[in-house]
Amino acid sequence: MRIGLVCPYSLTIPGGVQAQVLGLARALRDKGHPTRVLAPCDGPPPDAWVTPLGNSIPTAANGSVAPLAPDLSAQLRLIRAARDEDFDVINVHEPLGPGVCITTCVVKPAPLVGTFHAAGVSGAYKSLGPLVRWLAGRLDLRCAVSDDAELLASTKQLRHQVAARHAFWQRSAQQLRRDHQR
C-alpha cells in the first residue's frame, strides 16, 4: 500500500507532530509499505523519502508560533507530489491546519485519514463552522493522539453525520480495508 503522510509543520524545526510523523513513516517503511512524507522543510529534508514543500513561515496558532507553509507554491508542490505519487491512502496530520493540510482535504487525491493532535476548539473553528464541517467531511477516517484531541475530532463543529464516533471510525476503517483489498 502506497502511503502518504502530510505534516503541516516544517520537518527541520523540532516538534512533537513532526517527530510523530517521521516515526510513523519509518515504522510503515519497516513494515514494507512505500511511504513518503510531504511537508515544509527549511533546509535539506531529514530523509530521502521526504518531499519538501518549501520553507515555512512562522505563523501564530493556538497561542504559539507554528512553522507552516501557507504560500501558493507549497500548495502547488503538494498537489503535484500527491498526483505523481498516486498514493493509496494519505494520512493528514492536523487536517484542519492552514496550508498544506487544508489543501490536501480540498483536493482529496486519495482516501484521507485525519490525525488530530491539537486540543480544544479554536475560535476559528467556531467562526468558520460550515467550512470546517465541509473539510472534516472530506476525511474518510479520523483518529486522535490524545483524549483532548479526540474531543476536538468528535466535536459538533467537525461531525458531518450523527453517529457515535467509535462506530463511525470503525465503519470507516472497515471500508478502507475493503477498498484496499479490491
Task: Please give the residue ranges for each predicted region.
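Alpha-helix capping/helix-boundary segments
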Residues: 43, 96-97, 104, 148-151
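A short, active-site helix/loop in glycosyltransferases that binds the activated sugar's phosphate group
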Residues: 123-125, 136-162, 169-173
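N-terminal strand-loop element at the rim of the active site
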Residues: 7-14, 21-72, 80-81
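Short N-terminal targeting/anchoring amphipathic segment
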Residues: 78-99, 113
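Conserved catalytic-core segment of nucleotide-activated headgroup transferases in glycan assembly
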Residues: 170, 174-182
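Histidine-centered beta-alpha loop that forms part of the nucleotide-sugar donor binding/catalytic region
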Residues: 8, 93-94, 116-120, 165-167
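A short, histidine- and acid-enriched strand-loop-helix "catalytic/donor-clamping" loop
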Residues: 96-99, 111-127, 141
